[in-house]
């Protein structure tokens, strides 16, 4: 029986199902794997028995992924599972920032006791005249799971859509509308845009990527939308641009001491993925990833180990080795297997950065001394007997 510890409320209705052969436990010390959402694990003392962690969501800033990699713990996320929810909210922000909707609603609420509100509302509406999205230029930074959907939806709205993503995958390139015009530099994307929306992860080369230089390239009264990560935006630059009228509106999903005091902002409570459907999709993906790893050793959508698959574990034995990406690891592994007369039926090795993953099937079960010898190889983080 494989044991799972859940952290956080995984789904709105509380239903999380792994199926036969699994049980939920109350402490991480009892568990083989952790299913989680937003709890910060930095500084958390991870029990040695934990083999994997799956986050129901895309961002993993709350998990020390490299530290866990060195412990032989595979960290999974669920990219794209909540992308439709984020896309829909971004589209909503496009409309809200263009049509004076919030201001108009506030006027109605503030004048609720006016006996002549029908007449006065007709007079007041002149103050809330906005602009249509059709024909406006929008720049989409990042054409991954969310960005590609946003770009395609903006095409459907009749917008003039430009996209920037030097690392776009083949998968996302295939689904991107032909009407999305790709540009080669961030500056070319920003130049003349009426709207700019950001959909990239927080990394060393994306932190503060939208600052004064980029804002100054936008069209007058442009709208900036950030439903990616709060660090992508230089808050001081955005604040100044709003106060100087270079930006008409700023919409984001991150309430910070700085953003909440900016003028002309639409700020939500980190709600981009906040739908029941998105929560369920993320949980389903994370559960599927954990099950395939625990049962077969296969890795998909890991943030600290390479993708690797050998299908169902059907041989007499399957072993997985999590180790540093250094020379002669495979040679040392196969030497130990040969010494013990173990016949390797299939074998695969993949690497990603400093970490590597080797998995092999054998025609016979390996004895404990062979497994122990594998564990003693220098730079070996963990050896798993899957079957």
PLM regions: where:
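An N-terminal-biased, well-structured beta-alpha scaffold segment characteristic
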Residues: 1-79, 211-213, 217, 234, ...
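Rossmann-like adenosine-cofactor binding region
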Residues: 39-44, 167-259, 274
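Phosphate-binding beta-alpha-beta segment of Rossmann-like dinucleotide-binding domains, i.e.
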Residues: 79-137, 301-303
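Oxidoreductase and adenylate-handling cofactor-binding alpha/beta cores
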Residues: 87-106, 155-159, 284-298, 334-342
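Hydrophobic/small residue at the entry helix of a nucleotide-binding pocket
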Residues: 146
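Rossmann-like dinucleotide-binding domain for NAD(H)/NADP(H)
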Residues: 216, 220-313, 322-324, 357, ...
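A conserved regulatory-domain signal marking ACT and ACT-like small-molecule sensing domains
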Residues: 304-387
